[in-house]
From Swiss-Prot:
Residues given in the record as Ca(2+) binding sites: 257, 260, 262, 264, 266
Function: Involved in degradation of plant cell walls. Hydrolyzes the feruloyl-arabinose ester bond in arabinoxylans as well as the feruloyl-galactose and feruloyl-arabinose ester bonds in pectin.
Positions of disulphide bridges: 28-75, 63-114, 187-441, 256-273, 282-291, 503-525
GO CC annotations on file: extracellular region
Species of provenance: Aspergillus terreus (strain NIH 2624 / FGSC A1156)
Catalytic activity: feruloyl-polysaccharide + H2O = ferulate + polysaccharide
Single GO term (MF): metal ion binding
Name of the protein in its database record: Probable feruloyl esterase B-2
GO aspect biological process, one term: xylan catabolic process
Entries under Pfam families matching the protein: Tannase
Active site: 188, 400, 440
Length: 527
């Protein structure tokens, strides 16, 4: 046994650590009584030890989560914040014990009023003081917008900004040192919210990571609605079952896979892929298991075509080829897209009986003309954000089944044209990365593990993590030249089969060799 005098430092250190933990826990429990901010009603402040599987008893059932695993010790503060006389947001702020001096806001998805607890757990694990809100309503339906313009305004922009303002004040109250830098992390609707902050509140964040952004929002809603008139319902001549979409997908891959130089089942640049679906029209008398009818081939061709408005103006670019299998059960399932139907029912027409099967381009014109609270999020002059010193890193999966990656390219072009800046100048503050083999915000057939959330985590180093790459860009001035993605053998947390460095737009990946396509150094970013 060691002499007692050798054990004393260990005991002292252990006691000090325990005291710090006790002090943190006590600070958390007393924090609610110290919050006296206008329009803020604190529901509770509770200490959550790392390793807890946190029960989310009040989370709306449609949000799909009854619990959340939390890795770090955090102080969880839940509150309601009034945004008008008839609206409020539910806001949570999580303060980690391993605080790194960084503030972060998470975003939302779809039309939803769901706090993304998985993002809050993810970012507090990195030491960010993190806020998340319900976007001004509960659940995934658009019905709360019906005759409630204040709720709609929260959804369009106000929820995120309110959460940031309150969250920063609370962070300064909870930590004596306040915070040094402010960040944002979101995808889909969360991506749109990130760009809305860049456009409308250029001083809210030092660094914004915005994935698969749902900007050009009104036209995105219409684009999502326009697939049903193309496919028709199950049983119609124009409808393809998921199995038939797999047949179409395999033919598209056959025609386009090797454009990038590698036969790996991944299309590196879908803009170069213009499949000819007549090649698999069934011959007379042939089995239809591995070919399409003429009507079905036309459906595939029309699905891969942009949406134009009543006067021939481009509303929304085409769905990128390569996403067919992922999109089939959601966008091409023979039913009107639920989010689009809700938007037209409860926002555009204020008519709960509007039928999504009747959609046409006149409806698209009505939605775009309305554009409540500039929810389009399509402003292209980012000069104030640039002058503030802010950085925005956006990414988009090239197998995205819900929001076409072509739309992110279109916005990039709009910014370049509006600001009169070529890519090398935009790179100073705005970088866009196309992620081959990534579906909507994650998943897919390729190297989608870029660290934009728990479901894509493959390491915390900036080289393997898009959030920490943003931190490095903001705090050290080292901008990411590529975004490395991991191809998992069997989903997140499993063995990494290979990695690939995804290129900064407008560059694209080309296989040069030598070696196998699984070697990230066998690829080159070219313009």
């Amino acid at each position: 046994m060691a002499p007692i005098h050798y054990l004393l430092p260990i005991i002292t250190l252990g006691s000090a650590a325990l005291a710090r933990q006790d002090a943190f826990e006590a600070k958390c429990h007393s924090f609610a009584n110290k919050i006296h901010l206008p329009n803020v009603h604190v529901n509770f402040a509770s200490y959550v030890p790392g390793g807890t599987n946190l029960t989310l008893a009040d989370n709306p059932s449609s949000c799909g989560a009854t619990s959340q695993s939390v890795s770090a010790d955090v102080c969880r503060v839940a509150m309601a914040v009034a945004t008008s006389n008839s609206s409020e947001i539910t806001l949570e702020a999580w303060f980690p014990r391993n605080y790194t001096g960084r503030f972060l806001s998470t975003g939302n998805g779809g039309l939803s009023g769901c706090i993304q607890y998985y993002d809050m757990a993810y970012t507090t694990g990195f030491g960010f003081a993190t806020v998340g809100a319900n976007n001004g309503h509960n659940g995934t339906s658009g019905e709360p917008f019906y005759h409630h313009p204040e709720v709609l305004e929260d959804f369009a922009y106000r929820s995120i900004h309110t959460g940031v303002v309150i969250g920063k004040k609370l962070t300064k109250m909870f930590y004596e040192e306040g915070f040094n830098k402010s960040y944002y992390l979101g995808c889909s609707t969360g991506g749109r919210q990130g760009f809305k902050s860049v456009q409308k509140y250029p001083n809210d964040f030092d660094g914004v990571v915005a994935g698969a952004p749902a900007f050009n929002f009104a036209n995105l809603i219409s684009w999502s609605a326009h697939f049903y008139p193309i496919t028709g319902p199950p049983g119609s001549d124009t409808y393809l079952s998921p199995a038939m979409w797999k047949v179409a997908h395999d033919e598209i891959i056959r025609q386009c896979d090797q454009i990038d130089g590698a036969k790996d089942g991944i299309i590196e640049d879908p803009s170069l892929c213009n499949p000819i679906m007549e090649t698999i029209i069934c011959k007379p008398g042939a089995s239809s298991d591995n070919c399409l009818s003429a009507a079905q081939a036309k459906t595939v061709r029309e699905v891969l075509y942009p949406l134009y408005g009543v006067n021939g103006t481009l509303l929304y670019p085409r769905m990128q080829p390569g996403s067919e299998v992922l999109a089939a059960p959601i966008m091409y399932n023979g039913q009107p897209f639920a989010y689009s139907t809700d938007w037209y029912r409860y926002v555009v027409y204020n008519d709960p009986n509007w039928n999504g099967t009747t959609f046409d381009v006149q409806d698209a014109a009505a939605a775009l003309a309305q554009n409540p609270y500039n929810i389009q999020t399509w402003d292209a002059d980012l000069t104030p954000f640039r002058k503030s010193g802010g950085k925005v890193l956006t990414y988009h999966g090239l197998q995205d089944q819900l929001i076409s990656s072509e739309n992110s390219k279109l916005y990039y072009a709009r910014v370049a044209e509006t600001m009169g800046m070529p890519p090398e100048e935009l790179d100073e503050f705005y970088r866009f990365f196309q992620i081959s083999g990534m579906g909507h915000c994650g998943g897919g057939d390729g190297a989608y593990g870029i660290g934009n959330g728990l479901a894509t985590y493959s390491g915390k180093d900036p080289e393997n993590n898009v959030l920490m790459a943003m931190v490095q860009w903001v705090e050290k001035g080292i901008a990411p030249e590529t975004v490395r993605g991991a191809k998992f053998a069997n989903g997140p947390g499993s063995t990494v089969e290979y990695s690939r460095k995804h290129c900064r737009y407008p560059r694209r990946n080309v296989f040069k060799g030598p070696g196998n396509y699984t070697d990230e150094n066998a690829w080159e970013c070219v313009v």
